[in-house]
């Protein structure tokens, strides 16, 4: 970094660590984020400096570029700021302009600004937000854009000179290198030092407004031109600053409130589960499209009982069982039921039961056995078919409900435990909930609702070989 004392508004020659040289007007220095802002910047490329990636010069004039201080290799003051003429301190003057020539040559403070029609330094200094974004160098070396005056007119030359650096250029580079780098400014750089190039338009035709960056939202809105003769009142400025400084949470709340106003208002008669439209529609399924169900009168149980026909229900019940019985059954554990003679045994067993009932034999004789012959069907050495198992389950627990219901009907508890049989009559006792105890051999259907299903589902996986239940 070569000698000279830099001033705000002076022409600066800056060389980055990528060996690219830039020239522009010193706009401000942020020691908190260790950044340097230049206005009216032009890139001269790498020129003759040795580098791995030579870059040619560019003809465009950037309105505003922010450089990271740690990536600046050299900084030279080419020209000090030119003397600026000002109008006398007349309270009658609200705002003045000298035309385009003065704006380009920085002769008038009132029309001066690196962004063309941007407000003057005195207008910037009245905003506390700018003072927060672009802080001063330690001590009184750099003030924020200019001294604050009672009238928003021009600044005398002494005010601008007083707002310059009082340290040497080498000290300035040391402060920039020691400052922390700003992580949100890593994007949009063709060399490591370019932080933001907001405007790429040419200098003679600057836009009416320019965005300074993410940290300065006050400059992103349209700003008044120098031809305007009306001054903003302090109340209006306070209101605008209040809107700018509001946190993001308040803006999100305003957005949610606006959405909630657009939602149709639910009546008080609708269920409360319809709330939550702004939270992803939680509970919207609880709201009926045609409104809540309304009943004109109480339910008439007598008329409903009169319409109840038990014969029709029994007929439907038997039809459902018949349809299920007619379905072909899969072989269990590789055995073919057609060859086992189970059907003939079942038919013979039913015939024997009818003969016993017709003869009027005593159903319970404790001299012969402790068990009776009514509730026990284990007096015949046969295997129970799936059709009989379904029929017994239906008679005991009722018809099954929908297939996707986990508990309810006869598909309630017991789920899939049929393969856990052992000894006893568990699967063949009517209405036996647990199915444990007993003496005779059994396939081990543990009653319950899904005992038979469990054995059928796990028939292909040889579950009994690996997980045997101890006797």
Curated annotation (Swiss-Prot):
Residues 411-421, 432-452 have a biased composition (Gly residues). A motif (FFD box) lies at residues 362-378. Keywords: Cytoplasm, Developmental protein, Phosphoprotein, Repressor, Ribonucleoprotein, Translation regulation. It comes from the Eukaryota. GO terms for biological process: negative regulation of translation; P-body assembly; stress granule assembly. Residues 287-323 form the DFDF domain. The keyword Ribonucleoprotein applies. Residues 172-185 have a biased composition (Polar residues). A motif (TFG box) lies at residues 381-401. It is found in: Cytoplasm; Cytoplasm, P-body; Cytoplasm, Stress granule. Phosphorylated. Transmembrane segments: none annotated. Residues 172-292, 320-353, 399-460 are annotated as: Disordered. Residues 208-227 have a biased composition (Low complexity). GO terms for cellular component: cytoplasm; cytoplasmic stress granule; P-body; ribonucleoprotein complex. Belongs to the LSM14 family. Component of a ribonucleoprotein (RNP) complex, at least composed of lsm14a/rap55a, ybx2/frgy2, ddx6/Xp54 and eif4enif1/4E-T. Also forms a complex with prmt1 independently of ybx2/frgy2. Interacts with ddx6/Xp54 but does not appear to directly bind ybx2/frgy2. Different translationally-repressed mRNP complexes probably exist that contain either lsm14a/rap55a or lsm14b/rap55b depending on the developmental stage. The RGG repeats are required for interaction with ddx6/Xp54 and accumulation in ribonucleoprotein complexes. This is Protein LSM14 homolog A-B. It comes from Xenopus laevis. The lineage of its organism: Eukaryota, Metazoa, Chordata, Craniata, Vertebrata.
């Amino acid at each position: 970094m070569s000698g000279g004392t830099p001033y705000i508004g002076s022409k600066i020659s800056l060389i980055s660590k990528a060996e690219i040289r830039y020239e522009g007007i010193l706009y401000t220095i942020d020691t908190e984020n260790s950044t340097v802002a230049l206005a009216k910047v032009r890139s001269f490329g790498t020129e003759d400096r040795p580098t791995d990636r030579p870059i040619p010069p560019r003809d465009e004039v950037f309105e505003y570029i922010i450089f990271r201080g740690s990536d600046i290799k050299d900084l030279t003051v080419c020209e000090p700021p030119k003397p600026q003429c000002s109008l006398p301190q007349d309270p009658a003057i609200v705002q003045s302009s000298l035309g385009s020539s003065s704006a380009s040559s920085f002769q008038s403070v009132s029309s001066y600004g690196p962004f063309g029609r941007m407000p003057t330094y005195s207008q910037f200094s009245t905003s506390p937000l700018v003072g927060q974004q672009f802080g001063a160098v330690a001590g009184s070396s750099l003030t924020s854009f200019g001294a604050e005056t009672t009238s928003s007119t021009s600044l005398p030359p002494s005010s601008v000179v007083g707002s310059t650096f009082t340290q040497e250029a080498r000290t300035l580079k040391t402060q920039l290198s020691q400052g922390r780098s700003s992580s949100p400014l890593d994007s949009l750089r063709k060399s490591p030092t370019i932080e933001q190039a907001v405007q790429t338009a040419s200098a003679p035709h600057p836009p009416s407004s320019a965005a300074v960056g993410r940290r300065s939202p006050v400059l992103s809105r349209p700003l008044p031109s120098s031809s305007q003769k009306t001054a903003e009142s302090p109340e209006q400025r306070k209101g605008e600053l209040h809107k700018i400084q509001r946190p993001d949470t308040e803006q999100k709340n305003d957005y949610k409130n606006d959405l909630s106003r657009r939602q149709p208002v639910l009546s008080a008669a609708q269920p409360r589960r319809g709330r939550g439209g702004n939270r992803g529609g939680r509970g919207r399924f609880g709201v009926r499209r045609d409104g809540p169900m309304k009943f004109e009168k109480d339910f008439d149980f007598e008329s409903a009982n009169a319409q109840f026909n038990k014969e029709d229900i029994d007929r439907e019940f038997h039809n459902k069982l018949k349809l299920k019985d007619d379905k072909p059954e899969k072989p269990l554990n590789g055995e073919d039921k057609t060859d086992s003679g189970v059907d003939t045994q079942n038919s013979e067993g039913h015939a024997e039961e009818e003969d016993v009932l017709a003869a009027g034999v005593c159903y319970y004789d404790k001299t012969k056995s402790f068990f009776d012959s009514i509730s026990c069907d284990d007096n015949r050495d046969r295997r129970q078919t799936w059709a009989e198992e379904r029929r017994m389950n239906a008679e005991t627990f009722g018809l099954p409900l929908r297939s996707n219901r986990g508990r309810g009907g006869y598909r309630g508890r017991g789920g899939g435990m049929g393969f856990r049989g052992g000894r006893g009559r568990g699967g063949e006792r009517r209405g036996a909930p647990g199915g444990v105890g007993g003496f005779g051999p059994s396939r081990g259907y543990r009653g319950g609702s899904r005992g038979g299903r469990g054995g059928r589902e796990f028939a292909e996986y040889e579950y009994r070989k690996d997980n045997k239940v101890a006797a």
